A protein has these predicted regions:
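Periplasmic c-type cytochrome electron-transfer domains
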Residues: 1-94
Length: 94
């Protein structure tokens, strides 16, 4: 079986810039920028909403659990996204 996308550039939405861009990060280059990667990680791994990804993810698919969210507004003003982005930018290559 042949992969028809092998060797092709993956164009994805750069959420922080609001435009189409080349995917560079994440599984199969599905994220365009390290800022988007940081914001996505905060939301999906830790449940922290931020200016780039504002919508809560239903815990384990149970959206009724969001009724008990003590903070209905954004959990981060963008500072955590910037700090995580800076941390990953300054990490040395393995």
């Amino acid at each position: 079986m042949c992969n028809t996308n092998a060797g092709r550039v993956n164009m994805v939405i750069n959420h922080s810039a609001g435009r189409l861009a080349v995917g560079k990060f994440g599984w199969k280059a599905q994220v365009a920028s390290l800022v988007d990667f940081s914001a996505d990680a905060l939301l999906n791994e830790m449940g922290i909403t931020n200016p780039i990804f504002r919508t809560e993810v239903c815990p384990q698919g149970n959206c009724r659990a969001l009724d008990f969210n003590p903070v209905a507004s954004l959990n981060d003003d963008g500072r955590a996204v910037d700090e995580l982005n800076n941390f990953m930018t300054l990490l040395a290559a393995p």
